[in-house]
Amino acid sequence: FQKNNLIKIFNTGLGDVENNLTMYKDLNNDSQSSSFLKPKDHLKYHSYINFTLDEKEVIPIMKLDSYKINNANILCVDVQGFELKVLKGGERFIENCDAILIEVNRKELYEGCPHINDIDKFLKNFEFIRVSTKWWKQTIPWGDALYLKKNKVPFINRLSLVFKNYINTKNLTFFILSRFINIKNKI
């Protein structure tokens, strides 16, 4: 990313309050399940994952709006139950956003994590509509949801079949980007 001046990397977490938080580290899954929230039902679905606070990692938390990003129209969020806090810290960003791809839950996988209905309700305030949800498995209570701004709804009809095929694949991000912004170089 060093050669691309359009990409900036910040070594912080995102949330709704600027402070420092300690992370519950996942020791067995390449840290994919690490979270600022204490694991709850997550342990029922992945009993092999061990979480610890013994190896404490304190992470500085910033609000997305603190970065004053004005030229992005897509937001992707997968932060292990902290999704609603990231959204609340990015309300100004969300107002200018066209699409949000976010991990959602049907159960409380981490203590205090939002239910998909909480995400729906919050994003409705910004005129977003959930247009696609892909659960990992019928028996697994998490997945990914795609939200589009209400004024993009006519666009949905043309893409609805395509989204069903692309969501949860590595091609989805490129697919969305190619429809919403002009990509000059291959990713």
Placement of each model-derived feature along the sequence:
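Phosphate/nucleotide-binding beta-alpha loop and adjacent structural elements of enzyme active sites
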Residues: F1-I187
